[in-house]
Amino acid sequence: MRIRLVTVGKVKEKYLQDGVQEYLKRLRPYARVEIVTVPDEPIPDGASPAQEAQVMQREGERLLRALDQGGQEHVVVLDGRGKNFSSEELAAFLAERALHGDANLAFVIGGSLGLDPAVLARAGTTLSLGRMTFLHQMVPLILLEQIYRAFKINRGEKYHK
C-alpha cells in the first residue's frame, strides 16, 4: 500500500516533527508512506472573507497539482463535515481499499482556513477527525498515529485497546 499525506505548510514545531518521524518509521513495515508539503499562503491580518477565499483557492491549486493526475490515487480529504470513523472503521476502510486494488491513497490536509471547494470536489472520501478543532500542524501526527493503529488492528497485533 502507498499512502501520501498531501498537506499545506510545514510542521514547524520540533516535538510535532519528532512525532511525525516516529510514526513514519513505525509504518515502514506496513506501507510506503510519504508526506508531500505545499507552501501555505500568507493570510493578511484582518483578512476579509474574499481574501480568505483567495488564500484557500491558491492553496487548493497547489494541493491539486500535488495529487496524482493520472487518477491512480484514492483521494481522502480531511474536513470537519466529513465522515467520522472510529479506529476500527478506519482499519476496515484501509483493508477494503487494499482488497479492491485501490491501494494508493492520498490524505489531503488543508491549511488553517480549510480546503477550497475544488479540492473537496476531488475527494473520493471525506474524513473528519471529529468535531473538535485541531491546530492544522498537529493533524499529520494524529492521522499517522491512526493509520498506524489501523494497520495494527488489521493484523491483529498488540497496540490497540
UniProtKB/Swiss-Prot annotation:
Major subcellular location class: cytoplasm
Subcellular location: Cytoplasm
Protein name: Ribosomal RNA large subunit methyltransferase H
Keywords: Cytoplasm, Methyltransferase, rRNA processing, S-adenosyl-L-methionine, Transferase
Family from the record: Belongs to the RNA methyltransferase RlmH family.
NCBIfam families documented for this protein: PRK00103.1-3
Binding-site positions, S-adenosyl-L-methionine: 78, 110, 129-134
HAMAP family listed in its UniProt record: 23SrRNA_methyltr_H
GO cellular component: cytoplasm
Function field: Specifically methylates the pseudouridine at position 1915 (m3Psi1915) in 23S rRNA.
Catalytic activity: pseudouridine(1915) in 23S rRNA + S-adenosyl-L-methionine = N(3)-methylpseudouridine(1915) in 23S rRNA + S-adenosyl-L-homocysteine + H(+)
Entry EC no(s): 2.1.1.177
Subunit structure of this chain's protein: Homodimer.
Stored InterPro entries: Alpha/beta_knot_MTases, RlmH-like, tRNA_m1G_MTases_N
Organism: Symbiobacterium thermophilum (strain DSM 24528 / JCM 14929 / IAM 14863 / T)
A GO molecular function held by the record: rRNA (pseudouridine-N3-)-methyltransferase activity
Recorded superkingdom: Bacteria
